Structure formats: C-alpha cells, structure tokens
Regions:
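Acidic/aromatic-lined carbohydrate-recognition and catalytic surfaces
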Residues: 4-176
Length: 176
C-alpha cells in the first residue's frame, strides 16, 4: 500500500501510553498496582495528553511471566481488582474521551489453563488440537529449536513420548 494513499484512521493522531498494572499505582497498599490505581490517575493521564491507555495483561494468571501466562481469559486477576473495577475503568475512561486497549496474549496460555489441563489428560482428544503436541525422536525432543527464555522449545509430557511446544517459558504452552 502506498503511504500517500493510506486513509487516515482515528488512532493516527492519538497518543498512547502503556501501563503495566503491577507497578503503576497501588491503592490498597499491598505492593501491587491495581485497576483502581489506573482509575485514580485518569485525570493526570488525560492532562498529559494521553488518549489511549494500553494495559498489559491483568487477566487471571499464576504470574510465571508477569501475567503473560494467562490461566483464565474471562477473569481479572484478584491482585488487580474485579470485573466491576474494570467496568468502572471503561466508564471513567469514556467520560474523558479516552480509549482502553487491552494486551491480549494469543500465542500461548498458562499451563494451568483449563484447555491445557484437559489436553494433558487426553493428548489425542479435542483439546490436544488447541496445542502443538509431537512425538519425540529416539528419546529426544522433536527438534533442536530453542526457547526465547533458554532451553528447548519442547517439554516432555511425563510418562509419554509426547512433547508440547512452548516458545517462551515451559509453563506457557503455545496455542495452535
């Protein structure tokens, strides 16, 4: 596409700011930033000229990888607040003509996610298709590929000759 012919989109003139909730603003003094802390700082962010707030994962997670290992995409992690808090954040941002952009991790999930637990119980069943399962080669992983976090991208499923793929931590199986 020719940049000269590109249609201007609403976000082209907007200023975005990423918030990592865990370290942003802690309102309940537990040492962890929370959704209420983001709400509390909306006026400040608006005064800075921020139009779009990009929020790093705040879904339920065991926090092996700072929340990027999501165990439930439908729940807010209690460390950050509640779904009601999140609904309030959306309403308060809208009042200020601000947008909320959520960081959605779809490459992988947590090994604690219900789908992965079901896949482990039946590596040839329906949920196994949600992940990458491969047989090993002569007692070794299916390939010599390396994880971004070090070591093999393959983790053996205990008691089997099957491995699952994880480009990041072994606790973050890749989704198919």
């Amino acid at each position: 596409m020719n940049m000269m012919n590109m249609k201007k989109q609403w976000w082209h003139e907007k200023v975005a700011y990423q918030i990592y909730p865990k370290s942003f603003c802690d309102t309940n003094e537990d040492g962890i930033g929370d959704i209420r802390g983001i709400i509390e700082k909306l006026d400040y962010l608006k005064d800075l000229g921020i139009d779009i707030i990009w929020i790093s994962p705040l879904y339920q997670s065991p926090f092996v990888d700072q929340g990027y290992d999501i165990s439930d995409y439908y729940r807010i992690d209690p460390a950050f607040g509640t779904m009601e808090d999140f609904d309030e954040l959306l309403c308060e941002a809208k009042k200020r003509d601000m947008y909320i952009l959520m960081d959605l991790v779809i490459n992988h999930c947590s090994d604690k996610h219900e789908w992965f637990q079901k896949a482990l119980k039946d590596p040839y069943g329906e949920y196994a298709d949600y992940f990458y399962f491969e047989k090993g080669r002569d007692g070794a992983p299916p390939s010599n590929y390396r994880s971004y976090f070090g070591g093999s991208v393959w983790q053996q499923i205990e008691g089997t000759d099957l491995y699952y793929l994880h480009m990041f931590a072994k606790e973050q199986p890749d989704l198919n």
